[in-house]
Every structure is written in C-alpha cells, then in structure tokens.
Amino acid sequence: MALVNEHFLKLPNNYLFSDIAKKVNAFKVSHPKTDLIRLGIGDVTRPLPQTSIEAMYKAVDELANKETFHGYGPEQGYDFLIDAVIRNDYAPRGVYLEPGEVFISDGAKSDTGNIGDILRHDNSIGVTDPIYPVYIDSNVMCGRAGILEDGRWSNVVYLPCLSENNFVPEIPDRRIDILYLCYPNNPTGTVISKAELKKWVNYALENDTLILYDAAYEAYIQDPDIPHSIYEIKGAKKVAIEFRSFSKTAGFTGVRCGYTVVPKELTAATLEGERIPLNRMWNRRQCTKFNGTSYITQRGAEAIYTPEGKKQVKAIIQYYMANARIMKEALESTGLKVFGGENAPYLWVKAPGEVSSWKFFEQMLYEANVVGTPGVGFGPSGEGYIRLTAFGERADCEEAMKRIRKWLL
C-alpha cells in the first residue's frame, strides 16, 4: 500500500489566491456586467523587452539547424548567462562570485520552495510576518512547520513587520536555524537599510543561522543607499543564499527564469558536527531533480544585460514605478495610510478603522470593483491591510484609483 506524505494534509485546503478567485467568481455571477480591475496577483502586463524577443527568435533558429542545435544543457545553467549575471548584477557592487556559485533556474519560486531539500526536516524556521506564502507552505510540506494553530504554525518563529518598526523585524532573542528575509519586501513593498541588514548578518554569524534571502525585486530599488544584495554586507557569503528572478525585472513571468547564488564558503552541519558545503549539496540536488532551464529562455535572459536590453528593462521598471506613484498619491488623498511603492511595485494599504483584511477586500470589490489581496493571507501581522500591485496597465491603475476615491470620499 502506497502511503501519502501526510504533511501535505496539514496545508489549508485553498491557496490564498484560490480563495480570492472564488470570491471574485461569486461576485461576477451576481454582477455579470461589472468591469473588474485586478490589482491583486503580482503578474506583469508589459511585453518582453525587444532584445529578449530577438535573442529568443535567434535561439529558436539555432535549434532548427543541425550545426547549431542544442540538446540538454548544463543543470547549473549556460556559462554565457552565468557570466552576464556575475558581471552585471554583482561585480559593479563590489561582490565577486565564481561561476560555480550561480545556478540558473526556472524562477525564484521554485528555488525558494526547493531549497529545503538539502536541509534537515527538524531545523527551526524564522520568517518575517507578513510573508510570501511559499516560504511557509514549502516547509509545511516537508514536516518542518509543525501544526497550524490560530493562524500560526507551531514550529515557526514569526518576526512581526509592523508600521511601528518600519516593517523591519526586531532581532530575535533566541537562536533560529533558518531565517527567511525578502527585500524589497513582498507583500509590504518596504526595504531594509545596509545598517539593518548588517545586524541580521551579524546575528547569523553569531548564531550559525542560515539566511535565505529573496531579492526578486531588487531591480525596483530607487534609493542609492539601499542594498541590492545581501552580499554587499561583509561576512554574508558565510551565512546566506540569495534568490533572484527575471520575472518582475524583465517580464519573464510566463517565460520562467531566475537564479540562486550559493557561495562555496557557506556550510551547514551534520548531527555529528561535520561542516558540509551547501554549494555542493545544491549542485547535487539540481543534477538529480532539475534538467536545466531551456537554451531559448537563457538566451532571452542574457539579452537584458546588453546596453539596449538594460535601457528596455529600465523603461519597464519606470512604467510600473510610475503606476505605484500614481496609486500611492491617490490612496493617500483619501486619508488611507499607504506603505511601500517607492522602492518596490507593491503598496501595503491600511484598512480604515478596525476593518479586517477580508472585509476591506470585499468592500473594495463590491463598492469600487477593484480586486486586491487581503494582507492577513500573508500572515497574522498582515491583518488589517490589503496589498495592491503596480503591475497593471496605466489606464487600469488610474481608473482603479478614481473608483476608490469616489468610494471613500
């Protein structure tokens, strides 16, 4: 008799965005002629950079000819993209990586969810709260999170990110084995300074903590004093794995490409105390479970690092950040408190009074016909907030703000 992984049964029946879809579908049934504007799920709307499109066309043509055909590629990624990543994303910031420390993948979601494969099931977990749901759910699946009680997992240490602490959590007074950090932050849209990030690196060095650092939105940072990589902090290579994505940087949500940096000097321990390089373990995991990102996709990603590609990516980011400014100004004009939207494409909106996240979501849906994401879906500290994204079309963002202003003013 085959037995199931019963940890999966601990997961709530529905993923956050499935619950939202159900409520939206119920609304559409009762209001079939109403035009909804969706500012909830963070999917992009701008086309791919032209340089990427041309590079992928060329790659397809290469696959059509025997002389230039490519079959299986290296599980770690092609050298041409790894070199482009190191030269453009890290070297200019004084961070020097070896090619063997960068692993090309099909996206940050896959890697943040799969990294637990190389870590023991009984490691203690610390997460900023609110948080991207994948971090929690992937740990539930492997038995690391414990039992869900009153919206919290029993074996997870929650580090509240509140307006009172500028959405940067306090250093815990206990030791944590694995710590998830995401900056610029999803869902709050806030950032962390070098001084604050240095505190976390020092904590990790002192406590032998592994930091899993999600920097998927670093390209949206506008403030020159905000770090783009945790490796800008001295000592971080000894304690941190960094995840990045081309999804929001270059519109690759439907193409799928990202990468993970695992420094060779980063180690973790066996029960007997032997130190094992995590780079070696991740490489072994990828060689077994991943057959590499497609050649076509990697050529498209490489193209964003050309001079013209950089211009086109910058234009895409500026478009979304202009949306964020328009939205933030409009929302604040109604008296709402709004966080984020300055160095990230997310706005974290406080519901008026003591209104709950789901109530605020439903009011916005039924009164303004705008779809957001209830903050409590990202964790207990998200209660009373809603997340809006700036990834929509300009006209939709402007119309959504008109509707919300009309509703609230």
Swiss-Prot record:
Its cofactor is pyridoxal 5'-phosphate. Disulfide bonds: none annotated. One of its GO terms (molecular function) is L,L-diaminopimelate aminotransferase activity. The gene is dapL. It comes from the Bacteria. Homodimer. The keyword Transferase applies. Pathway: Amino-acid biosynthesis; L-lysine biosynthesis via DAP pathway; LL-2,6-diaminopimelate from (S)-tetrahydrodipicolinate (aminotransferase route): step 1/1. It catalyses: (2S,6S)-2,6-diaminopimelate + 2-oxoglutarate = (S)-2,3,4,5-tetrahydrodipicolinate + L-glutamate + H2O + H(+). GO terms for biological process: lysine biosynthetic process via diaminopimelate, diaminopimelate-aminotransferase pathway. Belongs to the class-I pyridoxal-phosphate-dependent aminotransferase family. LL-diaminopimelate aminotransferase subfamily. Signal peptide: none annotated. This is LL-diaminopimelate aminotransferase. Its EC number is 2.6.1.83. It comes from Phocaeicola vulgatus (strain ATCC 8482 / DSM 1447 / JCM 5826 / CCUG 4940 / NBRC 14291 / NCTC 11154) (Bacteroides vulgatus). Substrate binds at residues 15, 42, 109, 132, 186, 291, 387. Keywords: Aminotransferase, Pyridoxal phosphate, Transferase. The modification N6-(pyridoxal phosphate)lysine is found at residue 248. Pyridoxal 5'-phosphate binds at residues 72, 108-109, 132, 186, 217, 245-247, 256, 291. The lineage of its organism: Bacteria, Pseudomonadati, Bacteroidota, Bacteroidia, Bacteroidales. Involved in the synthesis of meso-diaminopimelate (m-DAP or DL-DAP), required for both lysine and peptidoglycan biosynthesis. Catalyzes the direct conversion of tetrahydrodipicolinate to LL-diaminopimelate.
